[in-house]
């Protein structure tokens, strides 16, 4: 017998919070990238090169997270709807 072991409303709230978080993260990343670009005009030693590579790698990882979690949000909302439909049938 199938069971619903999640509160659909909690799932919806999480999906909405994830969407907000992704938006905030994208805005922060854009701002930080602009500041880092400006910093590159005055910081040009070996440490800058090392940090720039780490920074770039981290930004790529964060972009992949945002892409993945942006796909998960709608999935979670559909799942919440299916669970709610299932619970109404009981």
Features from the language model and the residues they span:
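N-terminal secretion-targeting helices of virulence/extracellular proteins
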Residues: 1-90
């Amino acid at each position: 017998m199938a069971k619903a072991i999640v509160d659909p409303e909690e799932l919806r709230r999480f999906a909405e919070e994830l969407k907000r978080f992704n938006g905030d993260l994208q805005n922060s990343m854009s701002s930080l990238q602009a500041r880092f670009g400006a910093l590159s005009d005055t910081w040009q030693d070996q440490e800058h090169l090392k940090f720039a590579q780490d920074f770039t790698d981290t930004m790529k990882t964060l972009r992949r997270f945002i892409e993945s979690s942006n796909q998960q949000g709608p999935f979670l909302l559909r799942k919440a709807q299916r669970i709610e439909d299932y619970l109404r049938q009981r």
